[in-house]
Every structure is written in structure tokens, then in C-alpha cells.
């Protein structure tokens, strides 16, 4: 299921079904910002995730995440591409995208909302999120009108970086800032012109402008012997540091990519086929790992008489949990081709063998509970009794 909308180059918004290998690789997405509750990131060795665990509720303070998501999106656009998604791609993800554009382009909430709406017409942030975005607009405006404090802080950070790195080139940084100033001036002219016509920014008329956006107006450009390496600290601010050990960093990245794409990692040790017709369905690599739940004690509405079924007696006579007795009876697989092809409508349904049409399991975008008690969302669940496990011939 391909539910991705491009806002501008390297910046996408979508829904939960968009988080699958085919879509992420198709749009060259390297960073995924997941703004939804109870989400378990997948393929963390291949993609970089930022999980904002919040509900789409008026009581949620989403504004406190704007700085963190801004830095993450900047990093993602620099490295390749970034996808911001929530469950439906309507409220939470749209709010994060609007906040990013407001700060990145120094424009109003109305103009930023227009840009995201042109890319994805179904967006509809809840009223509380809109109020927070308008409050954020006032904060950004205040910072622009009183830049001395911000500039002073930036100068202090730059001084610290100069002490650590003698190869820092301030002239190139000035050139980078001037390029962003030129873009902002050109964009302001476009906005003023379009505001005379229903006060709406037309993405078609500003495509060329967006293509010239520098990846980060706040990043430091270094000389050819150094490379800026952004690091996300606990306070959600990215400190720009420079390093001359690019060969080591590159080698490490290559090793990770080779490891994740090697035949051994791709195939795994086993393949799994339909028990009825022996049609190959998925591999070890497609099975999702999850933290084991507490077994029957996770089901609140029944089996209360078995709350101690997974406990044994320790040396001191105390009851201890025996996790080895909690067994997962199903495989939860990732969004591979055969499973995604059966999710063309609705929020949940059954999974069938593509060859003999035998029922294999079920799928649900909202998630299902494993027999061990863990909640998996989204879920593509196949009971182990429906498939045969076979060795992969190499």
C-alpha cells in the first residue's frame, strides 16, 4: 500500500501503511518520524527512527516535540529523505510537518498549512494542535524580531566548535547563510504575490524554489577535509561537530549496509511455506521480533484462574516468573508483497495463500495480540500450524 505524499524534495508525509520496505526504498527514505502511540519500529538497522508516542487528542502537548522533530527532519533530508507519518496521515503527522515548514521557511501557519494541504489534501489537525501551531508561529515571530539572544547563543556554540576544530571555515558558513537568505527573500515575494489571490501558496509555482532549498539553514559548512556530523543530544538539540575521520565513519556505514543486505541476512536459515500446497511465503528475515509479554496474565477479561501458571518456586521459596513457558504460537511478519497485496480495503482482514487460496492468518492495521501477551501493530499474523519450516538451500 503506497500512501505517501511529497511536500518537497526529500520530505514526505504519509500514513502507517506507508512504512514498508518497498515504499521507503522507492522514495529513498532513510529517516522515519513516527508520530503515533504504541508503535514498534521495524528494520532499525536499515532506517533511522524517531518515535513520538502520542495520541491524536486535544489534551496532548505536541508543541514540545517541535524542536526534536525539526532537527530529525533536517538530518533526514541531509542524508537522503524523511517520512513523517501517523496512523492516517491526517492530524499528528500533518502538525509536525506544518511546524517544520513554519520554522524552516519563516512563514505563517496559514502558508505552511497551505503547502502541506496542497501536497496532501486530506490533512486535518485537531483544534488543539492548530492552536498550538498558531502559538508556535508567535514564538517564531518573536525570535525573529529579537534575534540578538539567539545570535548570542549561536556565537557561543560556534566559539566552542572553533576551539575543538582548527579546520572550521567561517567564510563558507557565511556563504551558506547568504544562500538561505536569498531563498527566503524569493519565497517571501512568491507568498506576497499569492496572498493577493485568496492568500494561498501554490506549490506548482514554487517547485523551482523548493528544489533550491539548502538542506539546513542552521548547519555549519566545513572545508573539503572535514564533514559535519550532526548528533542528537538528550535535550533534542543538534550540535554541529566536525571530524576528519570520514574514512572510518564511511567504512562503518558500508559494513552495516553490507551486513543488512548480505545473502545470509536476507535469506536467513529457514523458509516458510504453505502447509497445503508448499508455496514459499516468507523467510526468517521477514519475521518480526517482539518483546515477550506475560502470557495469560496479559488478557484482562479471562483466564484469571491461571495467573500463576507461568511461575515457579525459587530457592528462597518465592514465586518467580518462568518466561520460558510463555510460547508464541504465531509468526508476525513484515509488510512483504504477498501480505500487502491483500490489504486493498478496510482496516483488517484475512490472509490467504496466493497459490491455493488456503486461509493462513489475519492482518490488522490497528494491531493484534500475540499469544504471549504482546501487542503488535500493525500485524500480519500467521499461526505456526499453518506453515511448514524448511531449511534454506545455499
From Swiss-Prot:
Its EC number is 3.1.3.16, 3.1.3.48. The keyword Lipid biosynthesis does not apply. Belongs to the protein-tyrosine phosphatase family. Non-receptor class dual specificity subfamily. InterPro entries: Dual-sp_phosphatase_cat-dom, DUSP12, Prot-tyrosine_phosphatase-like, Tyr_Pase_AS, Tyr_Pase_dom, TYR_PHOSPHATASE_DUAL_dom. This is Probable dual specificity protein phosphatase DDB_G0281963. The active site is at residue 86. It holds the Pfam family DSPc. It catalyses: O-phospho-L-tyrosyl-[protein] + H2O = L-tyrosyl-[protein] + phosphate; O-phospho-L-seryl-[protein] + H2O = L-seryl-[protein] + phosphate; O-phospho-L-threonyl-[protein] + H2O = L-threonyl-[protein] + phosphate. Keywords: Hydrolase, Protein phosphatase. It comes from Dictyostelium discoideum (Social amoeba). GO terms for molecular function: protein serine/threonine phosphatase activity; protein tyrosine phosphatase activity; protein tyrosine/serine/threonine phosphatase activity.
Amino acid at each position: 500500500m503506497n500512501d505517501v505524499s511529497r511536500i518537497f524534495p526529500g520530505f514526505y508525509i504519509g500514513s502507517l501503511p506507508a512504512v514498508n520496505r518497498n515504499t521507503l526504498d522507492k522514495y529513498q527514505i532513510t529517516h522515519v518520524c513516527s508520530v503515533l502511540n504504541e508503535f514498534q519500529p521495524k528494520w532499525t538497522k536499515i532506517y533511522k527512527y524517531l518515535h513520538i508516542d502520542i495520541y491524536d487528542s486535544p489534551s496532548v502537548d505536541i508543541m514540545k516535540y517541535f524542536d526534536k522533530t525539526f532537527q530529525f527532519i533536517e538530518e533526514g533530508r541531509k542524508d537522503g529523505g524523511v517520512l513523517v507519518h501517523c496512523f492516517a496521515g491526517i492530524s499528528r503527522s500533518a502538525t509536525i510537518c506544518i511546524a517544520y515548514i513554519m520554522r524552516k521557511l519563516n512563514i505563517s501557519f496559514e502558508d505552511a498549512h497551505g503547502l502541506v494541504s496542497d501536497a496532501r489534501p486530506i490533512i486535518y489537525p485537531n483544534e488543539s494542535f492548530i492552536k498550538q501551531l498558531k502559538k508556535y508561529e508567535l514564538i517564531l515571530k518573536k525570535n525573529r524580531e529579537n534575534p540578538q539572544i539567539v545570535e548570542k547563543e549561536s556565537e557561543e556554540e560556534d566559539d566552542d566548535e572553533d576551539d575543538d576544530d582548527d579546520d572550521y571555515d567561517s567564510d563558507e558558513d557565511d556563504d551558506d547563510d547568504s544562500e538561505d537568505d536569498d531563498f527566503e527573500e524569493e519565497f517571501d515575494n512568491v507568498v506576497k504575490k499569492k496572498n493577493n489571490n485568496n492568500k494561498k501558496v501554490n506549490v506548482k509555482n514554487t517547485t523551482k524554489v523548493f528544489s533550491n532549498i539548502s538542506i539546513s539553514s542552521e548547519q555549519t559548512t566545513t572545508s573539503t577535509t572535514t564533514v559535519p556530523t550532526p548528533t542528537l543530544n538528550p535535550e533534542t538539540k543538534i550540535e554541529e561537530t566536525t571530524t576528519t575521520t570520514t574514512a572510518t565513519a564511511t567504512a562503518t556505514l558500508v559494513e552495516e549496509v553490507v551486513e543488512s543486505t548480505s545473502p545470509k541476512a536476507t535469506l536467513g536459515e529457514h523458509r516458510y511455506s504453505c502447509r497445503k500446497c508448499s508455496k514459499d511465503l516468507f523467510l526468517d528475515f521477514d519475521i518480526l521480533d517482539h518483546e515477550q509479554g506475560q502470557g495469560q496474565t496479559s488478557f484482562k477479561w479471562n483466564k484469571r484462574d491461571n495467573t500463576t501458571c507461568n511461575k515457579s518456586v525459587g530457592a528462597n521459596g518465592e514465586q518467580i516468573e518462568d518466561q520460558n513457558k510463555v510460547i508464541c504460537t504465531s509468526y508476525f511478519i513484515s509488510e512483504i508483497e504477498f501480505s500487502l497485496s491483500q490489504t486493498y480495503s478496510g482496516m483488517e482482514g484475512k490472509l490467504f495463500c496466493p497459490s491455493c487460496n488456503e486461509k493462513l492468518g489475519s492482518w490488522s492495521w490497528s494491531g493484534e495480540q500475540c499469544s504471549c501477551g504482546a501487542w503488535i501493530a500493525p500485524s500480519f499474523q500467521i499461526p505456526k500450524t499453518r506453515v511448514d519450516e524448511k531449511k534454506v538451500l545455499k
